[in-house]
Regions:
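Catalytic center-proximal scaffold of phosphoryl-transfer enzymes
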Residues: 1-244
Length: 244
């Protein structure tokens, strides 16, 4: 795809990636090693989909973000949400490698392409946002592929912003799992999730984690319920730097 004209780009440059299961036709499915098939139910092969786009700023309060997630019409939303510009997509499967070389994970192939896109489209002073879920391999690939370009930018301009953001939709899914483990009634679950998401969006993620662990201890959770809360707490803790 051609590189967009700088004057047509938005104020922020966003790079995002996610793993996707791709259904295989029979001929391709037969090429998947037998030992690998159990991890790909339904004859699916994992690919990493990457997208680079630009967008103008859209300022919202934590309350507005949470109300949008809950589809709460009582909370007014800003009008005229800016549209993403020049969404460039590309997806990669893992490269099996040749001549005894190790396989190249799909996340690295995707981020290598995305790094080229970012380098070609970035404008002086334009903030770069890396937006993903908490999958460690994606963040490792982003760091490996984009770090040299970012370091060059920071040498030229120490004020250059590179912001890592954890996708709030994935955050909310972990909060819901914890809520269902802690409370039996739906209204209590909703109140818990709404409160914790608000606090996370206000930068209080470590306080949220501490409180969730305390409640789990007070309730004496065990088994799958304790596992759900512990998994959510670990997810939030491991990604706290991306939820500031």
């Amino acid at each position: 795809l051609p590189t967009p004209a700088p004057d047509d780009e938005g104020a922020i440059l966003v790079a995002t990636a996610d793993g996707k299961g791709v259904p295989l036709v029979r001929a391709d499915a037969q090429q998947v090693p037998a030992f690998d098939k159990k991890e790909r139910p339904g004859n699916r092969r994992m690919a990493t989909l990457g997208c680079v786009y630009s967008v103008d700023r859209f300022v919202r309060t934590p309350e507005q973000i949470v109300s949008a997630l809950f589809r709460d019409a009582a909370e007014s939303q800003p009008e005229d949400r800016p549209e993403a510009r020049f969404k460039h997509y590309r997806a990669f499967f893992a490269d099996a490698g040749e001549d005894g070389c190790d396989a190249v994970p799909s996340a690295y192939s995707t981020w290598a392409w995305m790094a080229e896109e970012v380098a070609a489209r970035h404008q002086s002073g334009q903030p770069i946002v890396r937006l993903m879920d908490g999958q460690l391999s994606l963040w490792d690939a982003a760091e490996a592929c984009l770090s040299d370009f970012v370091e060059t930018l920071l040498v030229a301009d120490p004020t250059q912003l590179v912001v890592d953001i954890l996708d709030i939709v994935h955050v909310s899914s972990y909060a819901w799992k914890a809520a269902k483990a802690l409370y039996g009634h739906k209204e209590h679950q909703e109140a818990f999730v709404e409160d914790r998401l608000l606090r996370i969006l206000r930068g209080e993620v470590l306080g949220v984690v501490k409180g969730m662990r305390r409640i789990a201890t007070q309730q004496g959770l065990k088994g799958e319920k304790l596992k759900a809360v512990t998994t959510a707490c670990n997810y939030f803790e491991n990604n706290a730097s991306r939820m500031r």
